[in-house]
UniProtKB/Swiss-Prot annotation:
HAMAP family: NDH1_NuoD (MF_01358). It comes from Roseiflexus sp. (strain RS-1). The keyword Translocase applies. This is NADH-quinone oxidoreductase subunit D 2. PANTHER family: NADH DEHYDROGENASE [UBIQUINONE] IRON-SULFUR PROTEIN 2, MITOCHONDRIAL, NADH-UBIQUINONE OXIDOREDUCTASE 49 KDA SUBUNIT. The keyword Membrane applies. Gene3D superfamilies: Cytochrome-c3 Hydrogenase, chain B. It comes from the Bacteria. It is found in: Cell membrane. Its EC number is 7.1.1.-.
Length: 417
């Protein structure tokens, strides 16, 4: 795609029509370069058309769509329960957050009650997912700025979280563990001990990361004062998540629009004031500490609740227990029809939003009364947050683009869908 075509898609970006152009009266000559779509710092398949005056960024045009998979359209041909597996593959670094947003929207359509044990388990697992996602961000962000040790340390702890996910669901990343009405399976033996072991070591590990970076003069030089954005511009651009909270706006859906009983948990919303790369780093580091605290509270609640149902008792939604399937022909028929034909929510629409590691993630579903959704749309935070990149990049060096992209933490599977 040419620069002119990209400019036509976004008229706010004044890109020149040629690779180089003569300087007009009173301005300097600029040059247009492609960054990506195969550049390692773009954290996926992202192309940036960068207009430069020397090494100074005049403007940036993100060119997306290289990872488009048609997930939203594909979901229209799946039953509601089968479509869960597709939600894993949008933001593939936080699949449980996508599972949660989707199943909450379907449960709204159905008016479904979820057992308390399943709700608490959802909170615990999505907070572990938040930590795992932030560890990927921290490691790759540090690696982009030549801090390799942090990358290795962060992935060390992420492995422990992925081991927990594997214990629970059998999969390390594409878990598909949340189901409409509850969970796919009950929490296994050894889950409590595995989570407790991780929560014991994680605060000390965060201290290690901060000791390596927070007061590091090279890290400060590459992040402080770079890519700053104020709260007014952030809100106007639709920025959410750590990027918005780094501007001083304490907006977190877990507090402002609670779901899954988050209003009953004790945690703070970390904020900063300058809105630059360094503040976005500080906010995410503080968020990991808060997530550890939420996990501790949720784990204690699971202990207090004890064994119990993990799926709704509504047999129009939930499959019969396996013990019944082996004894009852009616249960076997019901199981077969539920997975082949699916349940049928009433006509209507529903929206469910959650606070994913990258910001506000919402799922909007339209039901026509059939067993398959008429329309599914994701409000993907990576997609919306990416439009703030030109605003943050103007006036900085081209080398700062690498750090800027990392500070937004985009996942291109979620951007392109």
């Amino acid at each position: 795609m040419t620069v002119a075509e990209i400019r036509a898609r976004n008229l706010s970006i004044p890109a020149p029509s040629q690779i180089t152009r003569p300087a007009l009266a009173g301005e300097k000559e600029t040059m247009v370069l492609n960054m990506g779509p195969h550049h390692p710092s773009t954290h996926g398949v992202l192309r940036l058309v960068v207009e430069l005056d020397g090494e100074t960024v005049v403007d940036v045009a993100p060119d997306i769509g290289f990872l488009h998979t048609g997930i939203e359209k594909t979901m229209e041909s799946k039953t509601y329960q089968k479509a869960v597996v597709l939600t894993d593959r949008t933001d593939y670094l936080a699949p449980l957050s996508n599972n949660l947003s989707y199943v909450l929207a379907v449960e709204k359509l159905l008016g479904c009650e979820v057992p308390e044990r399943a709700t608490v388990a959802r909170v615990l697992l999505v907070e572990l997912q938040r930590i795992a996602s932030h560890l990927v961000w921290l490691g790759t962000h540090a690696l982009d700025l030549a801090a390799m040790s942090v990358f290795l340390y962060g992935f060390r702890e992420r492995e422990q979280i992925l081991d927990i996910f594997e214990l629970v669901s059998g999969a390390r990343m594409m878990t598909s563990y949340f189901r409409v009405g509850g969970l796919a399976y009950d929490l296994p033996a050894g889950f409590d001990a595995a989570v407790e072991a991780f929560l014991q070591i994680m605060p000390g590990r965060i201290d290690e990361y901060e000791a390596l970076l927070t007061d590091n003069p090279l890290w400060i030089e590459r992040t402080q004062g770079i890519g700053a954005i104020d709260s007014e511009a952030a809100i106007a651009l639709g920025l959410t998540g750590p990027g918005l909270r780094a501007t001083g706006v304490a907006w977190d859906l877990r507090k402002t629009m609670p779901y899954c009983g988050y209003e009953t948990y004790s945690f703070a919303i970390p904020t900063a004031t300058h809105g630059d790369i360094y503040d976005r780093y500080l906010v995410r580091m503080a968020e990991m500490r808060e997530s550890v605290s939420i996990c501790r509270q949720a784990l204690q609640r699971l202990r207090d609740i004890g064994p119990g149902p993990y799926m709704t008792s509504d047999r129009k939604i939930a499959p019969p227990p396996k013990s019944e399937i082996t004894q009852s022909m009616e249960a076997l028929i019901h199981h077969f029809k539920l997975w082949t034909e699916g349940f049928k929510p009433p006509r209507g629409d529903a929206l469910a939003a959650v606070e994913s590691p990258r910001g506000e993630l919402a799922t909007y579903i339209v039901s026509d009364g059939s067993a398959k959704p008429y329309r599914v749309h994701f409000r993907a935070p990576s997609f919306v947050n990416l439009q703030s990149l030109p605003h943050m990049a103007r006036g900085h060096l081209v080398a700062d683009l690498v750090a800027l992209i990392a500070s937004l933490d985009p996942v291109l599977g979620e951007v392109d869908r």
